[in-house]
Amino acid sequence: EITNLRAILESFGAGIAAGKISQMKLSRLETLAEKMEVAAATGDKRALESITESNSEFHMVIINASGNIRLAEVIASLAHPLLIRRRFSGFAPARLQRSMAHHREIIDALRAGDNSWASAIVKSHILASQVADAGTTRLP
């Protein structure tokens, strides 16, 4: 249920953010994406902490860029770091790389100002985590 709520709410927020995100926030997203990619490349389970923190900030930068304070509050209450860390720990290396690629595509969509693309990729990105959460590492 939480994943579905996050997918709906965060995709809505990303669509709004695509039309108004600042260059400073886009730069921050780039920095966070790079930090997650470096941590993911180590293959070290301890890197999950770094990925989890950066991932949480990545998603909140987007939601905050929407300018919808209530939406940010609701999403922050749903995106508990322990749940996200557990999700990442269940990811096979290929799935983790796909998640990192999603982050790059999200940035591209936001930079393009394409609200439909941003909304769709964020929704896909969040829903893709359900496969790992269900205990399978099979790619769809």
Residue ranges and their predicted role:
Residues 125-140:
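Short, charge-rich amphipathic alpha-helical segments embedded
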